[in-house]
Amino acid sequence: MNKSGSLGMGLHQALSFSKPMMRVSRGEAVFWPGCALMGLDPAILERTRQCLERAEPGIGLSSCCCGQPSRYLFPGAHQARQEKLRRLLEKQGVKRIYAACPNCTQELEGLGEYQVLPIWPVLAEHVGPEDIQGPGGPATLHDPCPMRKDAICQQAVRRLLALADVTLTEAARCGENTRCCGNFHMMRALDPDKSRVMRQARLGDLPAGLPIVSYCEGCLDAFRGEGRRTIHVLELLFGQSQSRGWGNRWAFTRKGKA
């Protein structure tokens, strides 16, 4: 792992597992965006929660990190952070987690104590034409590699994009044949050179003249680093984010109840 990556992710994980950043609404169900997606405008995430509420009345919010970066970058700290997260979820009475992030979905399933539901099939059943506020238009789709075997989520995302009036050009490799963005298991920090090779290979599958849409904000961040235009599925549903970053994450965090 390079030094700058180590310092940056070390600070990220320390902040993510600090008390002010770990907020979970009291109740049986929460919407869990994940670290990267909390960088979008909070209004987009609130619209997402409202649509999920049609399936899960009273659903709350979680601003927590799943801890996957610590698993691969700081294994000595991972177990303690996982226990801290488990105690908070137990204290707040959480039983069901509606996860937006593919990596969070996998990590939270590993806890073994909660029903973890990807949000995409739920949204596909409960978002209507009247909810759409995105720009529509042509795009190409990147299926995140953690979702490679999840045909239900893949098809749900495509139904949502059709509803949002997106003219989709499929990647050369998609669905179960998708390729990694170069950051699986924190590869960008652990081996930047290998990560870049993987990312360039994946970008070769995606038509150069089209914006890349995905349901993983971490993947999109990697592609933006290579100069590609990107947009998250939630932005195509509920409006484009005017900014990205920790300011938005903090604003979202304040909506949760400690």
Protein language model regions, located:
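Iron-sulfur-cluster electron-transfer modules
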Residues: 1-113, 248-258
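Basic- and aromatic-lined ligand-binding clefts that recognize polyanionic substrates
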Residues: 27-32, 36-38, 42-45, 133-169
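Local cysteine-cluster metal-coordination motifs and their immediate loop/turn environment
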Residues: 33-38, 62-75, 98-107, 142-153, ...
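Alpha-helix C-terminal capping segments
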Residues: 50-54, 89-91, 107-112, 127, ...
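Short cysteine/histidine-rich zinc-coordinating motifs and their immediately flanking basic loops
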Residues: 77-79, 192-195, 228
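A short, acidic, amphipathic alpha-helical segment used as a generic capping/interface helix at domain edges
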Residues: 86, 191-211, 215
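Short, flexible loop segments at boundaries between secondary-structure elements
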Residues: 113-137, 171-179, 227-258
